């Protein structure tokens, strides 16, 4: 799985866990709807660190908490 795939998977996981809509995440993170759609559709090939910061903040967590999942372990990722 690519890093971007892992980010999308983590977003979906957290949306379910927190019973949060994508719209609410967009509002709380400051990420525009079009950009979020681009990420969630897999069309975005590079999710920047600043976007991950915004996502984590939107979920009310730190970046470390956002990335605290086995899907982000090096051996589980296709790193270019």
Which residues make up each language-model segment?
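A short, Lys/Arg-rich alpha-helix, primarily the initiator
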Residues: 1-20
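Residues within the helices of the helix-turn-helix
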Residues: 12, 23, 53
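Short, charged recognition helix plus adjacent turn
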Residues: 13, 67-80
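The alpha-helix within a helix-turn-helix
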Residues: 15, 26, 56
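Recognition helix of helix-turn-helix/homeodomain-like DNA-binding domains
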Residues: 31-46
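Short, basic-rich loop-to-helix N-cap that marks the start of a DNA-contacting helix
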Residues: 43-57
């Amino acid at each position: 799985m690519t890093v971007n795939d892992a980010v999308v998977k983590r977003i979906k996981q957290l949306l379910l866990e927190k019973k949060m809509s994508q719209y609410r995440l967009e509002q709380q993170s400051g990420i525009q709807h079009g950009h979020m759609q681009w990420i969630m559709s897999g069309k975005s090939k590079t999710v920047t660190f600043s976007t991950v910061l915004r996502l984590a903040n939107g979920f009310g967590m730190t970046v470390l908490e956002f990335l605290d999942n086995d899907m982000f372990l090096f051996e589980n990722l296709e790193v270019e």
